[in-house]
Amino acid sequence: MPLMSALRRIKLSLTVMLLLGAVACEPSTPGEINVKDQAEFKQAVANAKPGDVIRLANGTWKDFEILFTGTGEADQPIRLTAETKGKVFITGQSNLRLAGEYLEVSGLIFKDGYTPTLQVISFRQDKAHLANHSRVTEVVIDNFSNPERFEADYWVAMYGKYNRFDHNHLEGKRNKGVTMAVRLDTEDSQENHHRIDHNYFGPRPVLGSNGGETLRIGTSHYSLSNSYTLVEKNYFDRCDGEVEIVSVKSGSNQVRGNLFFESKGTLTLRHGDNNIVEENIFLGGRVDHTGGIRVINKGQIIRNNYLEGLTGYRFGGSLVVMNGVPNSSINRYHQVVNAQIENNSLINNEHIQLAAGSDVERSAIPVDSQFTRNLIVNDNGRDTFTLYDDVSGIRFADNVLNNVKNPQLAEGFSNQAVTLARAANGLLYPDSQALSEVGAKKDLVVLKKDDTGVSWYPKSDASIRFDTGRMIDVTATPGELREAIELAASGDIIRLTAGDYLLSKVIKIDKPLTLLGDNRSKIEFERSTLFEIVDGGSLKLSGLVISGKRSPDNVGNSVIRTSPYSMLVNYQIKVQNSLFIHLDVNRHFNFLNVAKSTMADSVVILDSHFSDVSGAILAMDKEADDYGIFNVDYAVIKNSSFTNVQGALASLYRGGTDESTFGPHFTLTNSALTNVGTGSKNKSKSSIYLHGVQVTTIENNRFSNTPAIKIEHTVGEPVTRIVKNTLTETPLPTVKELHSQAENTAVIKDNIIR
């Protein structure tokens, strides 16, 4: 072959090879780099220049730990985005770290997985490599939770300076750990001037433990540092994780223009000074434990906020001004000094708490503070103020109450008739021009849910709903009921015709389902449990007869049990108009058995009857480590009867002294207990054992030949009412304070002893 011809062929081959090697990262348009796998992504990042856009191909990227580094410019950031926003799914064990200058990420969805590290999104690679002047926008994190309920992580951790997190959608964090945290653990992350705006913080269910905040700025260790973070125009939708929805633990932050919708807890100025809270709207909708603003520390400004329909009390009230600890350590309660609380509207709320938390330790009252031009209106004319200590250090001036009878605070308040009307923004204002300078301003902007988050991802209602699906009829033919349950969809109703049903396998419940009978549908079962609730499951039983006569001769049977493993998704059980019999084949046959790291939003028993039970009805006491964790938020029993139950009717346990949760709650009304709690294996020696329950109502019941109700108060100010019960051959209830020398506040009255 001639030499020149050979050289031409070699040159052509090299050219083809170079073209093929570069095609994967060839810009489809100038500055745009399309990548379709992780190797191409790493190469694209390594070669990225200011102004470049790296696009991830549509589809699922599994087990993808994204490290996005680079140095862009103010007018030419380096961007990482989706080929089509909302069409790129980051799944499995995945996360995102940003490090560098002027970086921007958008359009991704984190779903069907969890982070293998401490954060899903982190504005740093490691402690030495932070992100500055960078932005995360239009990103979704949906139920991206570690399967171990109490394995803690953050979804978003902001480090560095001058970063922005905006128009993102975060929903369904179910494991322990704050949803979003601003971290100040080095000087390079302090005085950061971050901006957090227009985000949708979707429903966060009750965690049942400390560590369920939605947003935290700083920590107690760095709380004397300033953050200068702006939290603006975010929508907090039913963020119920714990008592602090937003926890500010640093100084000089602004929280303004946000909307809190039916969220349980408060915006808490926990640590740090000179924060401003203004133009926020709290809409409680009369939902339990919905709260407003809690004030601690120095120089806090609370102005032009609107708070309506909030039911919270104590640390969860509509407005709470705390007592402090003299010479407080950095992680306790610093005294309120120079607080300015002005031009706020508090409409139809339950509680305003001043000098809250006053005790032997928290004895430093608020001082040098102002409470001015605030509007406090309640349609029922009730005084919403509770004064726990001396409030002479607060100057009250130019405030308005509406016809409160015998108000505790008179000086600085005009007590008059106030007529309200809804304005165009949907908020209530006085119709009198004379009150135009009192309360929140009329031009207050009510943030719309649709103006937050992303436009291309639904803000769906994830609440558990029974009886919303199809009606499915089944007969007692062997296997038919089990097959119907397996094939049913969420919300379906399975209607059992009259007959005897024998189930030879455990029925796993992984969706909200109703089993409906007409009181002639009898179910027996041959395994150690009839129903097992697993993640996603909730169960309603109505009009059924359930017998344990055919169950195995084992210790520890149950009608319903939870998964033995950690459950992320809270569940509900509702039983009505049903009969449960022969639950006594062997010892400790409980109606409901639960495991550690499981949480019921509610267990409700209505108009039902239980007899011959060798265990307990509700054994919800598996969180015995005294960490403030519990198994059920609301346990409710009404209009029901219990006969010959060897264990306790209910055994609920929430140990420790942590003050971060609202539950558990226990209600027993209009019911009859006969020979309940009398078994020799009943360790509590009580008919009802409640340890650390926060709200208890036991009213208008009949107790016959049962041991005493035993209640142990552990923390906070539990609300316990035991009234109008008839006790026949039954001792009086006992209520004990385990960690306080104060006399307990339980109300025990109008009970009839026979």
What kind of feature is each model-predicted range?
Residues 2-14:
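Bacterial N-terminal signal peptides that target proteins for export
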Residues 23-24:
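C-terminal motif of bacterial Sec signal peptides marking the signal peptidase cleavage site
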Residues 27-63, 67, 464-498:
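Acidic Gly/Asp/Thr-rich repetitive segments characteristic of extracellular carbohydrate-active
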Residues 27-36, 55-64, 68-120, 143-145, ...:
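Right-handed parallel beta-helix/beta-spiral solenoid domain characteristic of secreted/periplasmic
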Residues 41-48, 62-71, 91-96, 270, ...:
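Short, T/G/N/S-enriched strand-turn elements that build extracellular solenoid repeat scaffolds
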Residues 45-50, 72-74, 98-99, 158-159, ...:
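Flexible, charged surface loops at secondary-structure boundaries
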Residues 62-66, 92-97, 111-133, 141-421, ...:
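Glycine- and acidic/polar-rich repeat regions and solenoidal domains
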Residues 409-477, 487, 737-754:
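Surface beta-loop-beta hairpin patches that serve as ligand-binding interfaces in beta-rich domains
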